[in-house]
Amino acid sequence: MLKILHKDYKDKVKRLLSVMLPIIGTQIAIMGMNFFDASMSGQAGDADLAGAAIGGNIWMPVQTCFAGILLAAMPLIANLLGAGKKEKISTVVRHGMLLAVAFSVLIIVGGVIFLPPFLQGMSLAPEVYHIALWYMAGLGIGVLPFFLITPLRSLVDTLGYTKLSMKIYLLALPVNACLNYVLIFGKLGLPRLGGVGAGVATGITFWLLLVMFAVVVSKLQPFKQYDVLGFVHPVKHLVAEYLRIGVPMGVAIFMETSIFGVVALFIAKFGTEVIAAHQAALNFSSLIYMFPMSFSLALTIVVGVEYGAKNYQGARDYTALGLEMSLFIAMIYMMLELVAREYIALIYTTNPHVIELVKVFIIYAIMWQGGDAVAAPIQGILRGYKDVNATFWCSMLAYWAICLPVGLLLDYKFNNGAFAYWQSLDIGVICSAVVLSLRLILLQRRIKKYEE
């Protein structure tokens, strides 16, 4: 750590923190919305929590997959900034918004057709089925604004104004909490919607966020100069470039997040209390995931700019720095979680049996968080290098070729019950961290040879 005295090192720490800390604030707000959905639904009843959980677990892989594709705007803009080609940024954002509209139509139509029979096939209790279905319907009103926000936020963040994005999301958070309270518990003369109200509240909040981002990029400098809200005629090679980078990113994220949804489907057979405990522990773990995710997004920006400027040593320096900081912070929150497991469980439920289950699930969550502290930042680094195919194949291997089969084996062969799938998630995340680390080492060696 003696090199911290070096001015260049200090400057890099300062720059990375200036990008990352507001992203953490934004992630806190985003995860806070999920937290309010889960915790308030849980206070309305176990069936409300279970129904909202099932709906959320279905929505999560869908939204992260398509939003992941749209996040291609971030490395594209970062590379253009580094290369001094700012005039091309507007086209990237406009094409992202065009794709956002197309994705929204696809998801809404697909949901109307396939969601009811899919939920029926899960053998849910009637009340849980009803809540899950209408939670998704309520959330559906916010699908379009959710995806339109992604390229706009990518512009704001990549230009270095991550603090502005943070302020927008933090402003929306209390609105979401109030809407949850009013709609879930039936206040201000409105009917009591229970877990369904959480979906409606989140959908409305997405519209509020879109309005705020649209005002920012159209009225404030330096965003106004890019004129990103106008219509664009799709250019074939630009759409192809966007999808070339975005699809592997989105599918890789889908592979990672959908495994949690699939696990929830297998856990559903163990009953409402187990579903509620699983969702409570998973929801809190998602809150913690904001730290490695924030490192991932920040490293995509700083590494992408350095790589676009052909400053390869700078990109390597940010890589090492980001991983060191991520692991250090992970050690702190993992120890705190271990000590505070019971208090965490009490946030979500007062059911003694559910509390005991949550405490065990959190132990398994702590194990995979160590792997996430390595895997998530490396994914962001690789995206900064525009090396997106590696994250796809690593996710496919770790989660679907290893994690899911191991979970099924531990459940059906060794009778480990619901814990089997959490044990397999630990194995999957650790495998992902190892494989991604190897890929990063090989990539940087190849770039170094190119320099020579």
Segment roles from a protein language model:
Residues 28, 32-50, 119-126, 182-193, ...:
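Helix-terminus/linker motif at the lipid-water interface of multi-pass membrane proteins
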Residues 18-37, 138, 172, 205-209, ...:
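Transmembrane helical elements of multi-pass membrane transporters/channels
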